[in-house]
C-alpha cells in the first residue's frame, strides 16, 4: 500500500489510499461554524488522522469495506456540533461502503462517507435529517427504539371492547312465549328497560330458543323500531320537527348502551330536565317516571326545594351552606336534609302520585337509584319487571311489587299471582340432626315457659326461665323412659309418686318397716 498524505485544498481535506477516497466537504452555508472548521482544517491533526487510518488499513489485503477513526481531539472540539447526513447525491463516496459500528468499540465512531458539522439549528439543510452528535451506535439504538415504539403505537390502537352478551329469559306473557332480557350487575339498564317494553309489546321478537343476545343486536332492533316510526301529523312544521327528533334520537342511541344522564325535578313524577336523551322515550311512546317528590305538607321543604332540578338543588346547597346569611344557611340545611331522608330516590308522596299518574296496563320506564326498570300497573298496583340474572332459571318469577319505599316487594308470576323462588334444600338440610332437633325443642319450651309466667303475672327472669325450660325439657325426655320402666317394673309408678306425693313416701316407709319384721 502506497503511503499518501492528506492535502488541504480550499477547506477540503482529501486523503488517498488504495481503493479508498475520503472527502470531507465544506458546506458553503456554514458561516457560524468557523471554530469547528478551523479545528478540522488543522494540518497536523488531519495528517495524524489520515496516518492512523492508513495504519489500520495496512493489514488488509482486500480493499476494506469500512473506515474508522478515533477522533478524540476532533470530538472534543466539536462536542457541541450536530452531525447531519446530506442527500445521496451530495454524500456519495467513491469506492466506499457504509460502515456499521460494532458494539465492542469503546471510542465514538461514525461513518466517514460524508460529514457536516454544524451548531444547533444552524447549517442544517432544509431537506436533510437531523441526527445526534453522539456516536452512531448510540444514535442507531435510540432511533431503533423510537421506531419500535412508533410502530408498536401504530399497530396497537385502542383496545376493542368485547361485545357484551345478555341472557334471554322466556316467560309466558298473555298466553304467548315472550323473551325478556336479563341484566348483569353493571349492564346497560336504559337499553334493557326500553327493549323489554318493546318485547312485551311484541314490537321486537327474537327467534325461538334464543338464549343470548349481543348489544349490537339490541341496538339494531332498537334502530329499526325508531326508523319505522311515522309522524302522527302531516303538517309541514310537524314533519320538520319530527325529522329533527329522529336525527337527534339516532345520535343518542349509542349512549343507551353505556347509560343515560337524566336530571329529575321534584315537582312531578313525569318532570325531568329536557335533554336529548328524552327524545328516544318520546318517539317510542314510552313514559318515563320517577317517584322522588317533595311532600306538599312540608312547606319549609317545598320552599327550599322549589322547582329546581337535582343538579340545581345540589349547587344551591353548596352555595347556601357557605353563605353569611343565616336564613340561606337554614334553607340549605333543609334542602340537604330532604336529600338525605329520601336517599332511596323515592318518597311516599311520590309513590302515591306515581300510582295515580300511571295508567292501567301501561308499560313504562321507572327511574330510581340511578337505575331504569320496566314498570306496569295492574289492577291499581305497581309492579317492576324482574330482570336480575340470578332469576334466569326462575320462569315463574316475573314481576316484583312496588308498594313501599324500602324496596322489599313480593315476587309474582306473569299473571301477577304471588310466588316464591324455588329452593331445593340438600339432604342434610331436609333432615336436621338430633342436636338441632333438641335445640329447636328447647327454644319452643322456653317460649312456652315465658307464656306461662306471663299468664301467672310473674316477672320473667333470665335464670328462672332457663331453669323452667330445662325442667320441661327433662320431663319430656323422661316420659318415654318411664313408660318403658312401667312395662318392665310395675312398681315404677310408686317410685315416681314418691317424688311428687308425700303420702306415697309415707306408704312406702310403712311397707319397709313391715318387711323388716320377722316371724318366729
UniProtKB/Swiss-Prot annotation:
Region spans: Ubiquitin-binding domain (UBD): 441-479
- Compositional bias segments (type: Polar residues): 43-54, 93-112, 132-146
Provide the reaction this enzyme catalyses: Thiol-dependent hydrolysis of ester, thioester, amide, peptide and isopeptide bonds formed by the C-terminal Gly of ubiquitin (a 76-residue protein attached to proteins as an intracellular targeting signal)
The family this protein is said to belong to: Belongs to the MINDY deubiquitinase family. FAM63 subfamily.
UniProt feature, compositional bias: Low complexity = 77-86, 469-498
Listed name of the protein: Ubiquitin carboxyl-terminal hydrolase MINDY-1
Give residue numbers for the site Ubiquitin-binding. 465, 468-469, 472
BP terms from Gene Ontology: proteolysis
Entries under InterPro entries matching the protein: MINDY, MINDY_domain
Under Enzyme Commission nomenclature, its number is 3.4.19.12
Question: Where is region (Disordered) located?
Answer: 1-155, 422-441, 467-520
**Species:** Danio rerio
Catalytic residues at: 189 (nucleophile), 371 (proton acceptor)
Sum up the protein's function in the record's words: Hydrolase that can specifically remove 'Lys-48'-linked conjugated ubiquitin from proteins. May play a regulatory role at the level of protein turnover.
UniProtKB keywords: Hydrolase, Protease, Thiol protease, Ubl conjugation pathway
User: GO molecular function, one example?
Assistant: cysteine-type carboxypeptidase activity
Q: Where is the composition biased (Basic and acidic residues)?
A: 26-37, 511-520
Amino acid at each position: 500500500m502506497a503511503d499518501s498524505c492528506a492535502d488541504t485544498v480550499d477547506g477540503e481535506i482529501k486523503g488517498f489510499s488504495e481503493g479508498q477516497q475520503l472527502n470531507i466537504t465544506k458546506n458553503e452555508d456554514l458561516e457560524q461554524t468557523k471554530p469547528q472548521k478551523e479545528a478540522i482544517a488543522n494540518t497536523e491533526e488531519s495528517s495524524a488522522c489520515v496516518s492512523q487510518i492508513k495504519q489500520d488499513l495496512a493489514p488488509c489485503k482486500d480493499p476494506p469495506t469500512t473506515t474508522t477513526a478515533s477522533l478524540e481531539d476532533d470530538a472534543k472540539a466539536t462536542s457541541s456540533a450536530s452531525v447531519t447526513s446530506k442527500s445521496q447525491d451530495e454524500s456519495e463516496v467513491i469506492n466506499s461502503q457504509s460502515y456499521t459500528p460494532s458494539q465492542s468499540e469503546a471510542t465514538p465512531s461514525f461513518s466517514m462517507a460524508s460529514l457536516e458539522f454544524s451548531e444547533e439549528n444552524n447549517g442544517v439543510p432544509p431537506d436533510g435529517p437531523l441526527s445526534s452528535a453522539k456516536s452512531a451506535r448510540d444514535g442507531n439504538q435510540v432511533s431503533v427504539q423510537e421506531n419500535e415504539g412508533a410502530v408498536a403505537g401504530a399497530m396497537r390502537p385502542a383496545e376493542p371492547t368485547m361485545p357484551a352478551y345478555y341472557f334471554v329469559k322466556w316467560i309466558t306473557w298473555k298466553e304467548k312465549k315472550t323473551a325478556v332480557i336479563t341484566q348483569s350487575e353493571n349492564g346497560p339498564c336504559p337499553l334493557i328497560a326500553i327493549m323489554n317494553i318493546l318485547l312485551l309489546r311484541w314490537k321486537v321478537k327474537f327467534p325461538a330458543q334464543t338464549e343470548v343476545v349481543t348489544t349490537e343486536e339490541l341496538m339494531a332492533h332498537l334502530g329499526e323500531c325508531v326508523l319505522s316510526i311515522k309522524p302522527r301529523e302531516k303538517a309541514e312544521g310537524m314533519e320538520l320537527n319530527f325529522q329533527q327528533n329522529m336525527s337527534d334520537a339516532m345520535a343518542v342511541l349509542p349512549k343507551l348502551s353505556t347509560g343515560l344522564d337524566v336530571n329529575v325535578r321534584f315537582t312531578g313524577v313525569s318532570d325531568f330536565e329536557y335533554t336529548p336523551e328524552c327524545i328516544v322515550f318520546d318517539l317510542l311512546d314510552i313514559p318515563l317516571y320517577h317517584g322522588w317528590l317533595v311532600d306538599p305538607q312540608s312547606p319549609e321543604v317545598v320552599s327550599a326545594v322549589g322547582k329546581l332540578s337535582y343538579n340545581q338543588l345540589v349547587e344551591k346547597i353548596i352555595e347556601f351552606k357557605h353563605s353569611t346569611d343565616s336564613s340561606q344557611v337554614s334553607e340549605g340545611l333543609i334542602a340537604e336534609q330532604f336529600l338525605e331522608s329520601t336517599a332511596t330516590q323515592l318518597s311516599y308522596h311520590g309513590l302515591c302520585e306515581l300510582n295515580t299518574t300511571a295508567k292501567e296496563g301501561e308499560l313504562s320506564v321507572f327511574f330510581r337509584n340511578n337505575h331504569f326498570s320496566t314498570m306496569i300497573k295492574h289492577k291499581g298496583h305497581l309492579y317492576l319487571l324482574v330482570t336480575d340474572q340470578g332469576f334466569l332459571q326462575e320462569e315463574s318469577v316475573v314481576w316484583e311489587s312496588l308498594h313501599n319505599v324500602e324496596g322489599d316487594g313480593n315476587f309474582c308470576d306473569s299473571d301477577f299471582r304471588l310466588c316464591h323462588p324455588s329452593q331445593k334444600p340438600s339432604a342434610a338440610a331436609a333432615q336436621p340432626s338430633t342436636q338441632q332437633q333438641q335445640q329447636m325443642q328447647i327454644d319452643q319450651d322456653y317460649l312456652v315457659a315465658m307464656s306461662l309466667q306471663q299468664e301467672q303475672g310473674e316477672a320473667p327472669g333470665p335464670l328462672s326461665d332457663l331453669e323452667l325450660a330445662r325442667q320441661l325439657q327433662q320431663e319430656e325426655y323422661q316420659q318415654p323412659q318411664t313408660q318403658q320402666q312401667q312395662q318392665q317394673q310395675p312398681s315404677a309408678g310408686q317410685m315416681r309418686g314418691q317424688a311428687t306425693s308425700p303420702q306415697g313416701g309415707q306408704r312406702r316407709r310403712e311397707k319397709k318397716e313391715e318387711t323388716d319384721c320377722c316371724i318366729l
